Amino acid sequence: SVGFKAGVKDYKLTYYTPDYETKDTDILAAFRVTPQPGVPPEEAGAAVAAESSTGTWTTVWTDGLTSLDRYKGRCYHIEPIAGEENQFIAYVAYPLDLFEEGSVTNMFTSIVGNVFGFKALRALRLEDLRIPPAYSKTFQGPPHGIQVERDKLNKYGRPLLGCTIKPKLGLSAKNYGRAVYECLRGGLDFTKDDENVNSQPFMRWRDRFLFCAEAIYKAQAETGEIKGHYLNATAGTCEEMIKRAVFARELGAPIIMHDYLTGGFTANTSLAHYCRDNGLLLHIHRAMHAVIDRQKNHGMHFRVLAKALRLSGGDHIHAGTVVGKLEGEREITLGFVDLLRDDFVEKDRSRGIFFTQDWVSLPGVLPVASGGIHVWHMPALTEIFGDDSVLQFGGGTLGHPWGNAPGAVANRVALEACVQARNEGRDLAREGNEIIRKASKWSPELAAACEVWKEIKFEFPAVDTL
């Protein structure tokens, strides 16, 4: 005999361990599992633990050369999901030694790798991850974080205002720079490259960077405020991306931008390191996230992508609006917004938070609310997101009937009115419309904006529910 029993495995025997006490150093995962008909939940949960850690489909004799108990993932708890037939939350604990230090790429390759194509499962979704301090301490994290950003910009006590330059594709560099200048001059803190703007035939990246830098300096000189434009450094290769970041630094730009999912975590982490070493803020766009996170029973929830970004590094990240044109249910959105900003977040299932997360000293990330929002949303946004956020109005600035600068003025006046009202103790949720109406009496720009967008709503039921 060869000393082991050949044949296909029953995963449950090795990988389902309901008595396991989780360690402080384990990475914990909560999976929403939909087994194929006839597959018991324990077997499905164990299969997930096995396939995302040390297991393979059959017994191999090299198993005897390692300590399986030390390295295997363990499914330690399974609970049915209320209101769903044949869906379960499977909790899996992974020993820390399974993962390379400082690599989101490696962590995801294991935890959300091949296991998602596993035949015994009809669908699989990663709902949440608990990152232990022992692992998060191996990452640099955000280049600067919320407090350092406020100090760099000298802006306190209010949300920051941004605007994505539209039309997103087709403008020449000079016209693009003009739009940037007008928005910043009108009172915004930031303007933004659209995520699709990289270096296309109608506008090469170097020309755009130059004209935008000119716009920033001109607006700063005229307003006495620090201004920024998110220069999108995303490129086809990591080398080209860094080349663009270097040029942005040479121009004295305060902030650059990256599409972290399409660009990839390896590229993003490299860029975040460059940004900290060179004093650049890093704005992160989440293009492609809905491919991964929008299906309720398969893929990965955005809160996991948000945690991964905080490890990989970024100072801002788009996080839904709750009120605009893009997906986001209020409590769930606030759950991952807190996971981005706060040092310590308690487990709270009503907000979709499955684990208590302690970030220790990893800097926080500013959530960005962007997509289909306008001046009438300002009270709600100020109330929902609070001061530590960036509110971005693309069409809600550039769609102003009098032009870009008046659009920016309208947003800035609306924001200042909301912050002042809140500081005076007024209830933004109830009195929001009244606050905006009153402010518009003193600002013709705001009055015009109020008139244009008074009836606009994007009312569809949210898909992202608990």
Swiss-Prot record:
Subcellular location: Plastid, Chloroplast
CDD domains, alphabetized: RuBisCO_large_I
Entry GO MF terms: magnesium ion binding; monooxygenase activity; ribulose-bisphosphate carboxylase activity
Record-listed E.C. numbers: 4.1.1.39
Signal peptide: none
GO CC annotation terms, alphabetical: chloroplast
Protein modification: The disulfide bond which can form in the large chain dimeric partners within the hexadecamer appears to be associated with oxidative stress and protein turnover.
Active site: K166 (proton acceptor), H285 (proton acceptor)
Record key words, sorted: Calvin cycle, Carbon dioxide fixation, Chloroplast, Disulfide bond, Lyase, Magnesium, Metal-binding, Methylation, Monooxygenase, Oxidoreductase, Photorespiration, Photosynthesis, Plastid
Entry's Gene Ontology BP terms: photorespiration; reductive pentose-phosphate cycle
InterPro entries on file: RuBisCO, RuBisCo_large_chain_AS, RuBisCO_lsu_C, RuBisCO_lsu_C_sf, RuBisCO_lsu_fd_N, RuBisCO_lsu_N_sf, RuBisCO_lsuI
Residues that, per the record, bind Mg(2+): K192, D194, E195
Transition state stabilizer (site feature) positions: K325
Keyword flag NAD: no
Reactions performed catalytically: 2 (2R)-3-phosphoglycerate + 2 H(+) = D-ribulose 1,5-bisphosphate + CO2 + H2O; D-ribulose 1,5-bisphosphate + O2 = 2-phosphoglycolate + (2R)-3-phosphoglycerate + 2 H(+)
N6-carboxylysine: residues bearing it: K192
Cofactor: Mg(2+)
Oligomer status and interactors: Heterohexadecamer of 8 large chains and 8 small chains; disulfide-linked. The disulfide link is formed within the large subunit homodimers.
Function of the protein: RuBisCO catalyzes two reactions: the carboxylation of D-ribulose 1,5-bisphosphate, the primary event in carbon dioxide fixation, as well as the oxidative fragmentation of the pentose substrate in the photorespiration process. Both reactions occur simultaneously and in competition at the same active site.
NCBIfam families per the UniProt record, alphabetical: PRK04208.1
Family, per entry: Belongs to the RuBisCO large chain family. Type I subfamily.
Name used for this protein in its record: Ribulose bisphosphate carboxylase large chain
Species assigned in the record: Moringa oleifera
